[in-house]
UniProtKB/Swiss-Prot annotation:
<dbReference type="InterPro" id="IPR038964">
    <property type="entry name" value="ABFB"/>
</dbReference>
<feature type="glycosylation site" description="N-linked (GlcNAc...) asparagine">
    <location>
        <position position="83"/>
    </location>
</feature>
<dbReference type="GO" id="GO:0045490">
    <property type="term" value="P:pectin catabolic process"/>
</dbReference>
<keyword id="KW-0378">Hydrolase</keyword>
<comment type="similarity">
    <text>Belongs to the glycosyl hydrolase 54 family.</text>
</comment>
<dbReference type="InterPro" id="IPR036195">
    <property type="entry name" value="AbfB_ABD_sf"/>
</dbReference>
<protein>
    <recommendedName>
        <fullName>Alpha-L-arabinofuranosidase B</fullName>
        <ecNumber>3.2.1.55</ecNumber>
    </recommendedName>
</protein>
<keyword id="KW-0326">Glycosidase</keyword>
<feature type="signal peptide">
    <location>
        <begin position="1"/>
        <end position="18"/>
    </location>
</feature>
<dbReference type="InterPro" id="IPR007934">
    <property type="entry name" value="AbfB_ABD"/>
</dbReference>
<dbReference type="GO" id="GO:0046556">
    <property type="term" value="F:alpha-L-arabinofuranosidase activity"/>
</dbReference>
<feature type="glycosylation site" description="N-linked (GlcNAc...) asparagine">
    <location>
        <position position="202"/>
    </location>
</feature>
<dbReference type="InterPro" id="IPR015289">
    <property type="entry name" value="A-L-arabinofuranosidase_B_cat"/>
</dbReference>
<comment type="pathway">
    <text>Glycan metabolism; L-arabinan degradation.</text>
</comment>
<dbReference type="Pfam" id="PF09206">
    <property type="entry name" value="ArabFuran-catal"/>
</dbReference>
<keyword id="KW-0732">Signal</keyword>
<dbReference type="GO" id="GO:0031222">
    <property type="term" value="P:arabinan catabolic process"/>
</dbReference>
Length: 499
């Protein structure tokens, strides 16, 4: 029970001027870690929210709120990253404990980057507005992860804690594991009960809930729990809002899952009760590391989008969490534009010309399933003209973006697979739709457009040795070379050779 003093303090903290961590503080469950790329989570916070590194010269900068307690300065990011690419290298802890999140190291599983590290997220994959002010979330493709194995003040053993995260309920998969929360300090699986983290996705390998997902569950290691029992729990609903509030808390022989729409309404309780009655989960053996986008052993096949989240000391009351939800709703999250450059019109037929000096007579075409560049002109054969012409359709995975259907092979689209661009028939799956959706960006060399992958926003259409890839600006693949990257990912949009 709250004292009258705490209830009054909580009421004051729930005003729009307060941040989520002010509310937790008023409820005697202070934040020990607070992460967001979109806004300050304390009313007085004016420090760095996150660090960027740009691809043109590897220079870094930090992005802070426009005002204390306010929204991130997206214009500073846009200026810093103009005509190049940017990665989010650090997500700073606002709590003062120094629990910053950086590129996750290898563990039980290696990541795809150099030396087994996970990938870093693109800085532009999740644009939003908060009360009309532009900001960017953290769009995390499979293989992307952040971690802190030396966190301070987080719960260990069976100590009580709470956490929440604002996530995208439309961006998920069934792989392990899109988590935010408490994990092992070794980046390896050290046994049941060694984690307590929010999970969002539609995995059914361990626990699952009602409907087809995604579900908010709790990753306690060696199991995702949707309720008291292993496997199915009907009380855990599918939750697919564009902005989801996921709240989890755990203490001695008790834990809870709560959730709701981060843009409106209140939180619902999906489970609140005793710990799972299976070996290792009562008491818990939490280790206190912090993860984002991955499992405790660096399982990194999941995808999702993170906007903000905190971890607390102590078991927050429902009243505190309800007030935090009111604060989140008052922030007025709205999805932003994924398109920044010359766009397309659904239904038009186009040809896309290379702008790299010395290659400007070449167009994106295909030979069977291989997407490549070929020299095409008015005297070319009808067959080649058709192979170099593309029907633009509304993005199969996201209606803001576009997909490109072959004129000579109707029903087949450009998609990435192992980061090669291929022409494949649409099989109707979620995976294909995501692989075949691309978002026009301002051209990196100033000519035409640059087309980035919706599902891997660090990767763009790139011609390399006359073959098309989904390439990043630097990376482990030969086609990720930084040499001539801006030219190689910029294409002029021209009238199609065939329709």
């Amino acid at each position: 029970m709250f004292s009258r003093r705490n209830l009054v303090a909580l009421g004051l903290a729930a005003t729009v001027s307060a941040g989520p961590c002010d509310i937790y503080e008023a409820g005697d469950t202070p934040c020990v870690a607070a992460h967001s790329t979109t806004r300050a989570l304390y009313s007085s916070f004016s420090g760095a929210l996150y660090q960027l590194q740009r691809g043109s010269d590897d220079t870094t900068t930090t992005i802070s709120p426009l005002t204390a307690g306010g929204v991130a300065d997206a214009s500073a990011q846009d200026t810093f990253c103009a005509n190049t690419t940017c990665l989010i290298t650090i997500i700073y802890d606002q709590s003062g404990n120094g629990n910053h999140l950086t590129q996750a190291p290898p563990g039980g599983f290696d990541g795809p980057d150099v030396d087994g590290y996970d990938n870093l997220a693109s800085a532009i994959g999740a644009p939003v507005t908060l009360n009309g002010q532009k900001a960017y979330g953290v769009f995390m493709s499979p293989g992307t992860g952040y971690r802190n194995n030396e966190a301070t003040g987080t719960a260990t053993g069976d100590e009580p804690e709470g956490m929440y995260a604002v996530l995208d309920g439309t961006h998920y998969n069934d792989a392990c594991c899109f988590d935010y929360g408490n994990a092992e300090t070794s980046s390896t699986d050290t046994g049941a009960g060694h984690m307590e983290a929010i999970y969002l996705g539609n995995s059914t390998t361990w626990g699952y809930g009602a409907g087809d997902g995604p579900w908010i569950m709790v990753d306690m290691e060696n199991n995702l729990f949707s309720g008291a029992d292993e496997g199915y729990n009907s009380g855990d609903p599918s939750i697919s809002y564009s902005f989801v509030t996921a709240a989890v808390k755990g203490g001695a022989d008790k834990w809870a899952i709560r959730g709701g729409n981060a843009a409106s309404g209140s939180l619902s309780t999906y489970y609140s009760g005793a710990r799972p009655d299976y070996s290792g989960y009562n008491p818990m053996s939490k280790e206190g590391a912090i993860i984002l986008g991955i499992g405790g052993d660096n399982s990194n096949g999941a995808q999702g989008t993170f906007y903000e989240g905190v971890m607390t000391s102590g078991y927050p009351s429902d009243d505190v969490e309800n007030s935090v939800q009111e604060n989140i709703v008052a922030a007025k999250y709205v999805s932003g534009s994924l398109v920044s450059g010359p766009s397309f019109t659904s239904g038009e037929v186009v040809s896309l010309r290379v702008t790299t000096p010395g290659y400007t007579t070449r167009y994106i075409a295909h030979t069977d399933t291989t997407v490549n560049t070929q020299v095409v002109d008015d005297d070319s054969s009808t067959t080649l003209k058709e192979e170099a012409s593309w029907t633009v359709v509304t993005g199969l995975a996201n209606s803001q973006c576009f997909s490109f259907e072959s004129v000579d092979t109707p029903g087949s689209y450009i998609r990435h697979y192992n980061f090669e661009l291929l022409l494949n028939a649409n099989d109707g799956t979620k995976q294909f739709h995501e692989d075949a959706t691309f978002c026009p960006q301002a051209p990196l060399n100033g000519e035409g457009t640059s087309l980035r992958s919706w599902s891997y926003p660090t990767r763009y259409f790139r011609h390399y040795e006359n073959v098309l890839y989904a390439a990043s600006n630097g990376g482990v693949q030969t086609f990720d070379s930084k040499t001539s990257f801006n030219n190689d990912v910029s294409f002029e949009i021209e009238t199609a050779f065939a329709s």
